[in-house]
Structure formats: C-alpha cells, structure tokens
C-alpha cells in the first residue's frame, strides 16, 4: 500500500493554496527546488502527475484525492493534539458556503460551536452549485451545496430550502411595472446577479416569462447584503431569500413583485467521512438550526 510522506503532501497543498511554487516555498520556509523535489517524489510514488502546471497550478484528479486525504488527517490530528496539549492553536475549519446562507442562517447555526470549541473558521464563499467542487478538490472539509449526491468517502444530509422571491421597492414597481410584471416590462427593468455564473434571476424569468438567458440587463455585485440594499433603494429588482428580507416585506419597504412565484433551492451539508468529533459537533449544529429555519417540505 502506498503511504505518502505528509511533508510531500503539504508541499502539494502549499503550491495549490499559494498559487505557485515560489510562494509555496516561502510559506514552507524551504527552497523552490525543494518544493519541486517533494512533489516529484510524490508523483513518482503514484506513477502519475498530481499537478497541472498551469498558472496558477491546479491539482489533477489524483491530486485532489490526496489533498482531500490531507484535510481529513490534519483535522483528526489537530483535534487529537488539542486533547493532549493545553494552549494549543484552535482547529482550522475550512468550509465552502454560499453567500446567501452566510448572510442568513449559517453564522447563527455555528454560534454554539464557536462559543464552546477552539475553532478558526475559514469560510470560502462560492455559489451553491459549485461548493461541492471545493470539497472534491480537498480545499475544504465541509460544504453547503444544492447537490444531493454524496461524493465518494463523504457524508451528506439535507439541511432544508431557501425560497427566493422576486422583489423590489414600491417606487421601482411603479416605475418599471405600472401595468404589472410583464415580459416586455422585464426587458427594461434592471436586475442584479452575484457573478457571471449566477443564473438564478435568468432561470426564474425563463421559467415564468419565457425570457431567454441574457435578455435582461444585470448588474454584477458579489454581496448578498448588497442585493437587499439595491432593492431597498429602488435600483434593481432582485431574487432574494425570503428569510433575508422578512422585516422589509412586513414593513412594505420591499414587495413581492410576483406573488405565488418563487425559486426554491434545497441545501445539503457535505463533509468527509469519517467525521472527527469536532466535525460531528458542527454537523449537529448545522442540522439542528437548519431544520428550524429552512423549509423542510
């Protein structure tokens, strides 16, 4: 059985994290040549490339598996050492999460664990359609995703759903939708997307108004909180989780522009198996809180 030296795995990890050999060498306090030698040693052991030497470098499929193994070992090792050593460094917990979960339910869900356990969070924000890929690549140890199928050697549980409403301010509705939300009116109404891969707004309009992708003008803003601000100030119409704007809807500051129409995103919690005790605590906290505030039907 091939058992890699974890120094060589750490070199591979550093090249990916630091996006190059030079910075990886600085991070590890060794020469760039030593980094290359360690990775070459690892590649010789497995008889195949572990890095695609692009700029920045990226792991091959086998490289991703080894990085995932490293994440699991580091988490279990750090937890064990934490039991044996007083005053040890808090555990680093890298999770891939979508921006809307981060803006609504995720931090309250993690609050009890953060209060009771020595954890350093590293939250990597990614669209919920792509968070699972970070887990696959070994960049994180857990991910909130819309994918229901677990990766090999991973566990998955349903968290619940976020319901997205198509909302805007009353002045915005009066300006752009004086005769209601129609296909022709939507072509002139400015909207917003999180990034160029965010297709929720376009999918909603295509499904309900038969508007093809790219037909509606969209701002690009990488912030869930900014979506709410843009809608409140009458700049755009937006797809926003109901959970995020309950107060604004109740006060009338925002209105549901298409009552009865919404987009539902079911969310799942993915993590490596077996779980460490700390990850079990995180899982329990996320599931307990998620089942309270997210839609379960």
UniProtKB/Swiss-Prot annotation:
Annotated HTH lysR-type domain ranges read 4-60
Which terms are listed as keywords in the entry? Answer: DNA-binding, Transcription, Transcription regulation
| UniProt cross-references to InterPro entries, sorted A to Z | ArgP, ArgP_gammaproteobact, LTTR, LysR_subst-bd, Tscrpt_reg_HTH_LysR, WH-like_DNA-bd_sf, WH_DNA-bd_sf
PROSITE patterns xref list: HTH_LYSR
Q: Report a single Gene Ontology molecular function.
A: DNA binding
At which residues is the DNA-binding region annotated? 21-40
- Short name of any one Pfam family annotated for the protein: HTH_1
UniProt xrefs under HAMAP family: HTH_type_ArgP
Query: How does this polypeptide assemble, per the annotation?
Result: Homodimer.
Q: Give the similarity note.
A: Belongs to the LysR transcriptional regulatory family.
Q: Which NCBIfam families match?
A: argP, PRK03635.1, PRK13348.1
Q: What does this protein do?
A: Controls the transcription of genes involved in arginine and lysine metabolism.
Q: What is the protein's name according to its record? A: HTH-type transcriptional regulator ArgP
Tell me the organism: Citrobacter koseri (strain ATCC BAA-895 / CDC 4225-83 / SGSC4696)
């Amino acid at each position: 059985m091939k058992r890699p030296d974890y120094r060589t795995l750490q070199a591979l990890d550093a090249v990916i994290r630091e996006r190059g050999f030079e910075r990886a060498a600085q991070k590890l306090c060794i020469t760039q040549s030593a980094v290359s030698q360690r990775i070459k040693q690892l590649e010789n052991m497995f008889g195949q490339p572990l890095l695609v030497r692009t700029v920045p470098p990226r792991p091959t499929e086998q490289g991703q598996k080894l990085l995932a193994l490293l994440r699991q070992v580091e988490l279990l090792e750090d937890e064990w050492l934490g039991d044996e050593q007083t005053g040890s460094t808090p555990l680093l917990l890298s999770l891939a999460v979508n921006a809307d979960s981060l803006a609504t339910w995720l931090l309250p869900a993690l609050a009890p664990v953060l209060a009771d356990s020595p954890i350093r969070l590293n939250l990597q924000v990614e669209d919920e359609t792509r968070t699972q890929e970070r887990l696959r690549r070994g960049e994180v140890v857990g991910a909130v995703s819309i994918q229901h199928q677990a990766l090999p050697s991973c566990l998955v549980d349903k968290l619940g759903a976020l319901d997205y409403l198509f909302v805007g301010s009353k002045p915005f509705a009066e300006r752009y939708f004086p005769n209601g939300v129609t296909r022709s009116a939507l072509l002139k109404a400015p909207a917003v997307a999180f990034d160029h891969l965010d297709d929720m707004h376009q999918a909603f309009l295509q499904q309900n108004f038969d508007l093809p992708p790219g037909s509606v003008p969209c701002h690009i803003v990488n912030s869930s909180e900014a979506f709410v601000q843009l809608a409140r100030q009458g700049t755009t119409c937006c797809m926003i989780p109901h959970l995020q704007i309950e107060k604004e809807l109740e006060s009338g500051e925002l209105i549901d522009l298409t009552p009865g129409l919404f987009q539902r995103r079911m969310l799942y919690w993915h993590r490596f198996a077996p779980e460490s005790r700390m990850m079990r605590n995180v899982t329990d906290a996320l599931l307990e809180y998620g089942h309270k505030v997210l839609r379960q039907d």
